[in-house]
């Protein structure tokens, strides 16, 4: 038994929540995952996380125009929230790979800009070009990271 989550954790907590409220929201997420998994189950998560940046530095453009009601987690919050439910087996930071992914997406968007504008309008296309440029810079300089976390279910968690 296993669970795979790609881009889920960014949508568990809202930007305006306090750190305590965010940890509680992540704890609820991990609690549900724990219940869904059979004993000995595994979970793999891919998520953007804060790197060398504070929550206060998070782009209001991304927070309001691209992913409203979303926020990147901090690794420490995820570790705290999963405590005694999951053992963290591995964490890998692939921010450089995701920088390349965002560059490829932006290149494809530019190459197909006319078709994209016809489909969703110039405002939406411009917004996503700006978003992808923000991401390319953020992943390049390490203000945001893309991590892959492997976790094993703790079958008899202590209260």
Regions found by a protein language model. Give the residues of each.
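A short hydrophobic/small-residue beta-strand
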Residues: 43-44
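A conserved beta-strand element that flanks and buttresses the S-adenosyl-L-methionine
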Residues: 4-9
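A short glycine-rich, Lys/Arg-flanked "PGG" loop and its adjoining helix->strand segment in the class I
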Residues: 20-40
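A short His-aromatic
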Residues: 11-16
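Conserved SAM-binding strand-loop segment of SAM-dependent methyltransferases
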Residues: 1
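Outer-membrane beta-barrel domain signature
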Residues: 19-20, 138
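Substrate-binding/catalytic lobe of Class I Rossmann-like enzymes that use SAM or dcSAM, i.e.
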Residues: 48-159
């Amino acid at each position: 038994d296993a669970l795979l989550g790609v881009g889920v954790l960014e949508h568990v907590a809202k930007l305006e929540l306090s750190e305590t409220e965010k940890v509680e929201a992540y704890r609820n997420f991990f609690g549900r995952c724990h219940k869904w998994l059979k004993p000995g189950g595994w979970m793999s998560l891919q998520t953007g996380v804060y790197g060398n940046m504070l929550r206060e530095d998070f782009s209001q453009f991304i927070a309001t125009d691209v992913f409203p009601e979303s926020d990147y987690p901090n690794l420490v919050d995820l570790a705290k929230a999963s405590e005694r439910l999951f053992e963290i087996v591995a964490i890998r930071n692939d921010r450089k790979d995701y920088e390349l992914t965002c560059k490829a997406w932006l290149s494809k968007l530019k190459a197909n800009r006319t078709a994209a504008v016809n489909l969703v309008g110039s405002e939406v296309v411009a917004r996503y070009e700006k978003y992808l440029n923000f991401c390319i810079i953020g992943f390049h300089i390490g203000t945001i990271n893309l991590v892959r976390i492997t976790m094993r279910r703790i079958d008899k968690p202590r209260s």
